[in-house]
């Protein structure tokens, strides 16, 4: 979800175009984030140390993480943490964004911070978005007096992610008296709470 929201922000601010964004999303499917990028993003390594390890890789038959531990730059525990984040969508998006556009990581970091401020998120909320934590993301968009609204929204998003696609994002919740749509699929639920849950399409 971060990729879609941040990508939309970059397009609206003329940093990238829609063609580049589509290219980034396609390449993300075949990408695992590089350990060096993750280590720098997490503040575990400086950019200079990561580049030094990259140079050492050309001289040794060893992986980035193994060299970093061998040189004493990171611990084995830190390496395990970095490895667990290689499939993180945020890390993959940042890496492919840099590869496709040539924008340096320091500048990308500034765009991320500008994006956070523009959407009004706290640093903690931004981290939830980066980590695709749906249970924490939904309340950031869905301000509702009834807690079941956010629970239903979170359930719907989890199922979209599991069974349909990860290529989507949500916007702020809206209370409306009418809604125009081209197609609608839903179901009425009756019980302790009577409600209609559905998906509507406005256009093609």
Residue ranges with predicted function:
Residues 118-204:
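Generalized protein targeting/export and membrane-interface segments
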Residues 1-138, 158-162, 178:
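Non-catalytic accessory regions
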